[in-house]
Regions:
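N-terminal helical hairpins
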Residues: 7
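Phosphate-handling catalytic cores of nucleic-acid transaction enzymes
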Residues: 10-448
Length: 448
């Protein structure tokens, strides 16, 4: 065009700025910085929590994703403590029961292995704590009705099957709503033809897992807006062949660490298992003593700042109707986690101080991206799933992927490939570069 090179460079810079703006709009960061650099250093200098020790032991035992042991460690503490430790708040009394959902892509992440290792410890301490691994709604309610104030774990390795049955089976109708209320410890009364089931002071813990694509395929927007899905803390991990380890014998060091962990759990049980006498009329009744947790003023201030930060992120996102309740509920789960960490120290009183609150927020920092990923990808159609698969293939390669290779690997016709690549291109997710008779595909956003 006989224009100077400076004009061409200005056009290139403007085009680059437009692409950057589109990437920021479509791909907002989910890495929430919830701690300052000073707070992060303070947390790193603190002694290891029970969860940290459990994660370290789990990593030494095999190649299961370490994130899964984090979920297992908190589930153990919740099973041990949520029946006797309560946190009085201005909104009511909070029970530190946590729900975890472990999502995996393949067997290399060892989802079931990590869950089994945690539950083996729980069952050694309390063989009766597992309510069920499957069953009807009535069966679950009957099990809870017989154990008021006692924690009960619903442990299911493949939760996608239950979600599918809830949608299809009439006898499971209303199960999602009932589980949501049980999480909050609400009184439930179910009137059946032959009996009446009354549940008082339930303490329900859910420890579930599943293949990520199957779980997301079964979740719909109603599950999110009703509050059922946001009550879960989601843990995700991807397969890493570099972490693969062949099976071998247990070493003495590994066994000793497990014994130390079990000894700590036994001390927890002994510390928090005590009876007290209450008077009902002229009668004296023995019941388990309840320990009231509290937060220092500094811990309350830091928690409220953290909760406000989470809610603001949800409100300012592109879809506040799903992100806001999800992050708000995750904030409450973080408060429960802080109570569990404080109670695990077996001091004379359960008090959450500022360092303990910072430890809990550090865990939440890793949980938040998983929750956001789940609600953002819930209920995707088959075509959207195909777009995701192909985009991730392109994203994994820093040198680009040939269009012909994508068509061969995913058995695409020319028309199907045109539709998929045009869609990804117009969404600002990929860049297409001519390469001979075909084209090379690059992701505009590459995982670090």
């Amino acid at each position: 065009d006989n224009l100077p090179e400076e004009s061409l460079w200005r056009d290139v810079c403007r085009a680059h700025a437009r692409i950057d703006a589109k990437r920021e709009e479509i791909l907002p960061t989910t890495e929430l910085e919830l701690l300052t650099a000073e707070e992060r250093s303070q947390v790193e200098a603190l002694p290891d929590t029970f969860v940290d020790k459990f994660v370290a032991w789990g990593k030494s035992r095999g190649d299961a994703a370490w994130q899964y042991f984090e979920a297992g460690g908190f589930t153990i503490l919740s099973a041990m403590l949520s029946g006797v430790v309560k946190l009085p708040t201005s909104f009511g009394t909070m029970t530190p029961n946590l729900w975890f959902m472990i999502l995996a892509d393949t067997t290399l992440t060892r989802k079931s292995t990590a869950m089994d290792m945690a539950m083996d410890m729980v069952l050694e301490i309390d063989p009766d704590c597992v309510l069920a691994t499957d069953g009807s709604l009535e069966g679950l309610l009957q099990a809870l009705a017989g154990r008021p104030t006692k924690p009960g774990i619903f442990w299911r390795d493949e939760f996608s099957g239950l979600l599918e049955m809830i949608k299809k089976k009439d006898y499971l109708a209303g199960m999602v709503e009932t589980l949501t209320k049980l999480y909050d410890g609400k009184y439930q009364k179910r009137v059946l033809r032959k009996e009446v089931i009354e549940i008082r002071d339930p303490v329900l813990i859910m420890f579930c897992g599943g293949i990520r694509s199957r779980i997301l395929g079964q979740i719909d927007m109603e599950n999110i807006t009703s509050g059922f899905i946001p009550r879960f803390i989601f843990i995700e991990a991807e397969s890493d062949i570099a972490m693969y380890r062949p099976i071998g014998p247990m070493t003495t060091a590994q066994d000793d660490v497990r014994k130390d962990l079990m000894a700590q759990l036994i001390r927890l049980r002994e510390h928090y298992t005590s009876q007290m006498t209450i008077h009902i009329g002229d009668q004296e009744v023995q019941t388990n003593k309840t320990f009231e947790a509290s937060l220092t003023s500094e811990a309350w201030d830091r928690y409220n700042k953290f909760e406000q930060q989470m809610v603001n992120f949800g409100v300012e996102s592109g879809t506040p109707e799903i992100y806001t309740p999800t992050l708000d509920r995750l904030s409450k789960s973080t408060l429960k986690a802080a109570v569990l960490l404080a109670a695990s120290q077996t001091t004379s009183k359960v008090e959450v101080d500022l360092p303990t609150m910072l430890q809990a927020i550090k865990y939440a920092e890793s949980w938040a991206p998983f929750s956001l990923d789940v609600v953002a990808n819930a209920g995707k159609t088959g075509s959207e799933k195909q777009l995701d698969i192909i985009y991730k293939t392109i994203q994994r390669s820093t040198e680009g992927v040939l269009r012909s290779r994508v068509m061969q690997n995913y058995h695409l016709t020319a028309r199907e490939a045109d539709w998929i690549l045009q869609t990804l291109d117009q969404r600002g997710l990929i860049r297409r570069v001519k390469d001979g008779k075909t084209e090379r595909l690059f992701a505009t956003y590459v995982r670090s």
